[in-house]
Amino acid sequence: RQMCIRDRDYSIRLAGITGQVRPHIEKCRVLVLAADNGVTAEGISSAPTSVTLSQVINMTRHKTGMSALAYYFGNEVVVADMGIDTDRPIPGVLDRKVRRSTGNIAREPAMTRQQALQALETGMGLAAQAAADGVQALGIGEMGIGNTTTSAAVLAALTHAPAQAVTGRGGGLTDAAFEKKKQVIDRALALHRPDPADPVGVLAAVGGLDLAAMTGAFLGCAQNHVPAVVDGYISIVAALTAVRLCPAAGEYLFLSHASYEIGYRIAAQELGQEPCLLLGMRLGEGSGCPVMFQILRAACAIMDGMATFPEAAIEDDYLAPIRAQDSFTVTP
């Protein structure tokens, strides 16, 4: 079949994941894992921690970038509280709280190993529930002020990269705050010395409850044969952590859009994948997922409906010279 090479690759991968020669992606869901991060006490975030709760509430009202897109495209949105810094119940949000916020990684571990495992297993369970609900593609998003800092720390720990190479400005920082952010990450890594061969230990030491649950969600997608859509920086770091735990999970990942965070490229290279879209978004939340769902649907439509040359009554002898070249092939 003649088609966009990437759409062709997507449809082939979807066929392998679903076991269907002509896969269909209809029911899609964005799963948002939300938690606060104690490292914000170091003054490395432009927004106060209260924004986490406010944005989670706005998600349930379709008032954030991600939820507005999801609502427009007819996608489901499920938000789970993994560790928002509040005791109040949040209508429309699943209560899966492991603890209120995490520890300040510059001074103490983010959480205990048992708490990291609890968050990871919760994410796996939420992905399994999505599969049971008939979801055919699950996007993994997040909400948590300070989570670009924890993501950079986790990525640095997993890849031996210096903080300078994986740390961006997140939601926006002054030059002074940006330098402090890198120093805080360096200090956290020096304090905890997380072992890259122990991804759960890395999450417990310098990660976040949102990251741990997202990691579990990616593992749960693989376990239940559900295509998993990766959003931006935080999401791709969680995806890489999942792959470090279970390399086969990488076969279920579909990278949506490229993040402007400097560490995104490192994580993508570690996964051996390229993002599909360059949208210039700095929203997080899972905002790239609803758009990527449409790309996957398009790939399925091409596989299902596009004719081969013989089916279209087109003679393809003229392609012989092109096919003879190693640098360019056209697949009938």
Language-model segment annotations:
Residues 1-5:
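Short, small-residue-biased leader/transition segments that mark boundaries at the very start
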Residues 99-148, 152-162, 170-177:
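Glycine-rich, mobile lid/loop segments that gate access to catalytic sites or pores
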